[in-house]
């Protein structure tokens, strides 16, 4: 039952998260020489109403920001017909970058992994993504962030000459969540 309800919440949360207006990366260009992460956490009540949206980044520790989110009528209808009014669903959409070697791709303890995608990136000397390949997937759903979106990212340019071989990094996209009951 939990998985089915969470799956419905996820379908709704995905549309909600897409509508969330969050700050993008805190830097104009992302760092390809050090690991970092960014995440958006959306809390949805049992009636399908978004209760909160929070953006956090390791690039600016301790500077979490609120984000605006709207639920579509369809998302609200799905959740209100399948969830208890005293229940909340918390869904987190996270991306992690690891230079060189593939990093941790697990959901935090206590959360259920709903979707995962790991991409190997080749980052050129000018900071553009020159190559992308999905190297691992997991969970029941596929995150809406793939090679097309990763290829649009801008990383800091390399200090090396423009003939240097591309730097390798791994972008991990995770969707995970859990339900909470109000007592």
How would you label these PLM feature ranges?
Residues 8-12, 81:
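Generic detector of low-complexity/intrinsically disordered segments
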Residues 2, 19-183:
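Charge-biased low-complexity segments
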């Amino acid at each position: 039952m939990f998985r089915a309800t969470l799956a419905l919440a996820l379908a709704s949360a995905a549309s909600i998260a897409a509508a969330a207006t969050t700050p993008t990366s805190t830097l104009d260009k992302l760092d390809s020489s050090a690991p970092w992460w960014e995440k958006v956490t959306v809390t949805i009540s049992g009636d399908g109403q978004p209760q909160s949206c929070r953006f956090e980044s390791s690039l600016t520790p301790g500077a979490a920001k609120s984000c605006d989110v709207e639920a579509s009528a369809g998302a609200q209808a799905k959740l209100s017909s399948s969830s208890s009014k005293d229940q909340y669903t918390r869904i987190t959409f996270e991306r992690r970058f690891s230079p060189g070697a593939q990093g941790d791709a697990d959901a935090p303890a206590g959360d259920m992994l709903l979707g995962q995608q790991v991409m190997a990136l080749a980052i050129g000397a000018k900071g553009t993504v020159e190559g992308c390949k999905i190297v691992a997937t997991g969970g029941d759903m596929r995150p809406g962030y793939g090679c097309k979106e990763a290829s649009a990212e801008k990383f800091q340019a390399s200090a090396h000459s423009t003939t240097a071989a591309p730097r390798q990094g791994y972008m991990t996209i995770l969707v995970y969540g859990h339900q909470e009951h109000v007592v």
